[in-house]
Structures are given as C-alpha cells and as structure tokens.
Amino acid sequence: YIDPHYGVIVEDGGEVLPDGVTDNHQATKYQKRVTELKNLEASNRLFIELVEELHRRGMKIILDGVFNHCGSFNKWMDRERIYENQKDYQPGAYISPDSPYRSYFHFLKDDEEEWPYNPNYDGWWGHDTLPKLNYEDSVKLENYILYIGRKWVSPPFNVDGWRLDVAADLGQTNDYNHSFWKKFREAVKDANPNALILAEHYGDPSEWLQGDEWDTVMNYDAFMEPVTWFLTGMEKHSDEHMEDL
C-alpha cells in the first residue's frame, strides 16, 4: 500500500508521542494511520489518480524497489512494535518465533528463548534498522516480491518501471542474485513489456546487462562522482567539510 501520510487519511485517532519519548510502541496516532485499511485503500486510489494525471501530461513514473532489505518498522519484522497490538496483523519476526515472517530474515541467534523481541538478526551492513531479506530460505518471500514487481506495473496502477535499490546486494550469493533478477525481469516484462528496470549499482554492471536482468543502471561512476568532485572537491561519500564552499 501507499503510506497514508503521502496519500489519504480517512480515519485518524490515537496520540502523538509525548515530548522526550522515542518509543514507537507508544506512537498510537501513527499506528492508527498506517494500519487502518480505509486509509491504505484510499491512498492507493489517490496514487492511481496521480499516475493517470502524470500520463495525461506525457510524464512517466517509476517506483523505488527496496528488495534487498526492509525497514525495522515493516510489519514483517516490526522491531518498532507498530503492529504488535493491531488485531488484523500477524506478529512480526522480531516479536514472536511463531511469526509467519520468521523465515524472511536470518536470525543469528534463533533459539526459542531469544524471543520475544529478538534483536539478533542480519541487517544490511550491520544496521539493525535495515533487516536484510533472507530469500534463499524463503520461497514464499521470493514469490511475494515477484508479485510486487508485477503488481505496480499492471493495471490499475500502471507504473512505468522500477528503480532497484542496492540491487547487486540482494541475496547471499552472486549466483542467487542473478537468478532472482532474471525471474524479476520475466515477471515485470510479462506484466508490462515497456516497464523500465533501472538498478542502483557502483562499479562494472556488465554481468547484469546481458539482456535478461536489468535494463540499465544509475550512472554514479561517470556522472555523479565526477560532478560531485567538481562542485565540492570531495568524493560523494566523504564525511569531510570544506570551509571555503
């Protein structure tokens, strides 16, 4: 679904966090907004209207597909405990060992006594706010992401393609990575042959650009890096600060 904060809030309720409180488990207003089905469905309808208007004006729209990892607030993990007490949602993998999403993640400590609230999972680059998705151990997860790839480029949404976040990092091995993107391309192009598959990638992307995976890549090496250096005198990811700029 489209986040209602960017879409439509039909039903509101709950309370904002008090000053000084950072526990999202108490963010009842946020919880009400993002778990209420009426808000989610209304937001999707608004998105359909947005895409129709963009196309009427001769414009295209692509979505950012973050399929290597999710956020700690995602209902699959629910480390922020947003969905824990919502009656229409199953427990996240952080909450319960019986979560239907447990296999979506690799838990470094997976004995039953580590739950509830098991923080010992693989995060992308070690970030616990970015739980890495565990495709190799979950056919269900793979099939769901392929479904997502098809869904948004198909009617009634009719998005014009995908931008794939850290696409080369997906999966645990290079072999699986290529296998997945071939399946993803087949799913997307079957739904919408004109959909663009644009990957975020640093370095040589040639092994993914053989006609059966990505269409193209974001041109970091030949555009963003030199332009950043020209404008700032620093590499794009530098933490340095130049006082004369």
Which residues make up each language-model segment?
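Active-site and adjacent substrate-binding regions of carbohydrate-active enzymes
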Residues: 1-245
